[in-house]
């Protein structure tokens, strides 16, 4: 299979969030320097093939001292205990006319001629294989539920409020202005965007793109001071006014974008504002679901009352029921979203809540308080990254584990949802439940980058495609822009991340085609180099590469010709060198070079990647601290998933700079600072050397600062020193 080792037989779409036979979060993202090594993606790199990846220094001590150094220190051992595909993207189908669409459903649903079963053995073998794959599925997530037809209720509306033309729900989805919509769709087809820039108080800068033409210009940002300024269902309005009478600066600036149905890329998410962002997005999602459902029920009632209902054209729904998709990194992040939603809805009943708690909630403290705050936010609780969950709303009840086609909101990790969809080469492929998604919320997108971003790309490529089956749809009620294959222009995408990356930027420009517009909110950076709290000589060396494709080879050639000689010239001086390598593919290349090149034969080295076993990690750290390893190779994803406290670091070499500026501070200030405190390094003697190219400009801005990045990328000199 292109994306893993198995497909999964599903007991109702939305089930099966179980484990898989492959491990290791992440994989190649399509390029030679993708995050992670092999395709697939879960866990923290356990279960990879093992081979020699170290060279010990020759010591004159006796065998007893050698055996003692093999054992990890008490500090390291305790930390170990506590830390314990090439995708063939489905082409987007050409626009179908309403008649052609109906004919395809009629053809698919027509009786099929009976065929003799000629190959019984083969079919039985396939059934056995499916059963074996089912055994590897998490039973707690299985859904045994029939797919329901369209909503037929005629009563039970949350509140029978009048349609408000000023409501963004009306203006964007229900009754958009035909003239404005037509004009903007034409601009979208031509790829024309008019830029508007505005300053958001205490937040950053918003660059808003509206389908149209014209020169970029500044505009005053809109703000909403409290929930009073939102068009909310009355029940939600009553609850949120009690919880949040007024908005903070972030909510005031972001609310107009979110509730105005514009696409949003927000790259300033952190542990301090995570709760506010979660509340705002969940409120918006539930408000959208309630308005959609109430409109359908209200129109059902109208049709039931009217004598001449054939004259009524009430287009109020999509092909399938699910309207909101939330892509999240872990089960714990799903728990936080669900808890926020229940606090806003205050349902009288919660069906299958105990089952949800048993499957998703883990109240044990997995990590000690010495782990960074952002690490504990991401990995606290149940950190399994293989899950999917359907949530269904009725008038008084929230139902967990509803079948996808019966759900209003789908929560999933990228891996969990991709396995639910299936693979194009497999017999069972189903993405019709994504055909009518109107809001996508991607929270902690930077964490998803450290898993396998190709799963996210795959999911976005399968959003809002016209369905292959009717699924009981009443086509007389389907909105015209669904039938015209324009749903992608109405979908709102919201991505929340701690920082911007080329992958997020690409998704923002290629997948965000919202006719309402899109906004990117970011801030300026003073630079992590100024936030170390430690005197360290920091040297940044620029390499010039012609293209991003040639960057890995140019970087390797620079490393072997300019940096390796400084280590081998006096191998004793190389002791305590930490070599940080962001990409797993680069890590493999450098590790093999250390293992096989005669040039590095005088250097002893160890290595820690996301696929290194805990026992091997402990040994590598112990040998590095004792001096048996001069050099320690260390990947960014290993640091992301474990945050090891490595001792004995006297010099840091960065083969490439990290995406996350927090990692820079933890490695440079944290590791070198610890060596100073423990007396292994004289104050002021620690050093850093980092290699970068113009393709690293986003990373470099966060590390060196917004004011310095352009000079470092464009100036003639290629070496920049900071103290």
UniProtKB/Swiss-Prot annotation:
Translocase listed as a keyword: no
Single annotated GO MF: rRNA binding
Locations listed in the record: Nucleus, Nucleolus
GO CC, alphabetical: nucleolus; small-subunit processome
Family matches, as InterPro entries: P-loop_NTPase, UTP25, UTP25_C, UTP25_NTPase-like
Biased composition (Polar residues): 100-109
Compositional bias of kind Acidic residues: 60-91, 124-150
Keyword hit for Nuclease: no
Superkingdom assignment: Eukaryota
GO-annotated biological processes: maturation of SSU-rRNA from tricistronic rRNA transcript (SSU-rRNA, 5.8S rRNA, LSU-rRNA)
Biased composition regions of type Gly residues, renumbered to the chain: 11-40
Keywords: Nucleus, Ribonucleoprotein, Ribosome biogenesis, rRNA processing
One Pfam family cited in the UniProt record for this chain: Utp25_C
Region (Disordered): 1-159
Family to which this protein belongs: Belongs to the UTP25 family.
Function summary: DEAD-box RNA helicase-like protein required for pre-18S rRNA processing, specifically at sites A0, A1, and A2.
Quaternary assembly: Component of the ribosomal small subunit (SSU) processome composed of at least 40 protein subunits and snoRNA U3.
Name listed for the protein in its UniProt record: U3 small nucleolar RNA-associated protein 25
Species name: Botryotinia fuckeliana (strain B05.10)
């Amino acid at each position: 299979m292109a994306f893993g080792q198995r497909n999964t037989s599903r007991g109702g779409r939305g089930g099966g969030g179980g484990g898989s036979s492959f491990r290791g979060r992440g994989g190649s993202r399509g390029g030679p320097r993708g995050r992670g090594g092999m395709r697939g993606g879960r866990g923290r790199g356990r279960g990879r093939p093992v081979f020699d990846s170290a060279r010990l220094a020759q010591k004159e001590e006796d065998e007893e001292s050698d055996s003692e150094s093999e054992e990890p220190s008490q500090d390291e051992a305790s930390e170990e205990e506590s830390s314990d595909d090439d995708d063939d993207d489905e082409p987007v189908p050409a626009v179908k006319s309403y008649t052609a669409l109906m004919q395809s459903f009629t053809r698919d649903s027509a009786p099929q001629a009976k065929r003799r079963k000629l190959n019984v053995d083969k079919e039985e073998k396939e059934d056995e294989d499916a059963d074996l794959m089912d055994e590897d599925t998490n039973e707690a997530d299985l859904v045994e539920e029939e797919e329901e037809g369209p909503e037929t209720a005629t009563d039970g509306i949350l509140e029978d409020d009048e349609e408000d033309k000023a409501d963004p729900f009306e203006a964007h989805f229900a009754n958009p202005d035909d003239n404005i919509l037509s004009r903007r769709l034409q601009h979208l087809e031509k790829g024309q965007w008019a830029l508007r820039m505005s300053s958001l108080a205490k937040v950053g800068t918003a660059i808003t793109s509206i389908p149209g033409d014209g020169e970029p210009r500044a505009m005053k940002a809109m703000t909403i001071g409290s929930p009073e300024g939102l068009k909310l269902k009355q029940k939600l309005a009553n609850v949120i006014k009690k919880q949040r009478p007024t908005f903070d600066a972030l909510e005031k600036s972001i609310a107009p974008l979110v509730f105005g149905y514009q696409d949003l890329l927000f790259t300033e998410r952190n542990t301090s504002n995570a709760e506010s962002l979660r509340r705002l997005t969940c409120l918006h999602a539930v408000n959208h679901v309630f308005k959609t459902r109430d409109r359908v029920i209200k129109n059902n009632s109208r049709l039931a009352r009217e004598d001449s209902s054939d004259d009524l054209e009430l287009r109020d729904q999509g092909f399938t029921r699910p309207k909101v998709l939330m892509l999240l990194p872990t089960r714990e992040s799903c728990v936080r979203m669900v808890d926020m939603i229940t606090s806003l809805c205050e349902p009288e009943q919660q069906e299958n809540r105990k089952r949800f708690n048993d499957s998703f909630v883990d109240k044990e403290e997995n990590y000690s308080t010495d782990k960074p705050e952002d690490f504990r936010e991401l990995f606290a609780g149940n950190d399994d990254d293989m899950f999917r969950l359907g949530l269904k709303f009725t008038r008084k009840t929230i139902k967990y584990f509803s079948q996808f086609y019966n759900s209003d909101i789908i929560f999933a990790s990228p891996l969990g949802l991709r396995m639910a969809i299936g693979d194009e080469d497999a017999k069972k492929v189903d993405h019709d439940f994504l055909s009518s998604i109107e809001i996508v919320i991607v929270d902690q997108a930077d964490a998803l980058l450290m898993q396998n971003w190709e799963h996210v790309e795959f999911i976005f490529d399968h959003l809002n495609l016209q369905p292959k089956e009717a699924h009981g749809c009443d086509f007389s009620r389907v909105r015209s822009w669904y039938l015209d294959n324009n749903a992608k222009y109405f979908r709102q995408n919201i991505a929340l991340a701690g920082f911007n990356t080329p992958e997020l930027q690409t998704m923002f420009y290629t997948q965000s085609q919202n006719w309402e517009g899109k906004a990117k909110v970011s801030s300026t950076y003073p630079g992590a180099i100024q936030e170390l709290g430690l005197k360290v000589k920091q040297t940044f060396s620029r390499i010039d590469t012609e293209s991003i494709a040639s960057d890995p080879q140019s970087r390797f050639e620079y490393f072997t010709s300019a940096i390796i000689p400084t280590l081998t010239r006096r191998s004793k001086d190389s002791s305590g060198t930490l070599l940080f390598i962001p990409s797993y593919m680069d890590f493999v290349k450098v590790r093999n070079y250390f293992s096989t090149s005669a040039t590095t034969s005088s250097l002893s080295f160890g290595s820690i990647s996301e696929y290194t076993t805990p026992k091997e990690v402990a040994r590598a750290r112990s040998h590095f601290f004792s001096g048996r390893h001069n050099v320690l190779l260390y990947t960014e994803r290993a640091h992301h998933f474990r945050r090891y406290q490595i001792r004995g670091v006297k010099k840091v070499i960065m083969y490439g700079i990290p995406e996350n500026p927090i990692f820079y501070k933890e490695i440079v200030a944290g590791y070198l600072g610890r060596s100073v405190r423990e007396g292994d390094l004289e104050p002021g003697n620690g050093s850093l050397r980092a290699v970068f190219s113009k393709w690293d400009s986003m990373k470099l801005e966060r590390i060196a600062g917004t004011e310095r990045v352009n000079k470092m990328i464009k100036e003639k000199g290629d070496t920049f020193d900071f103290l």
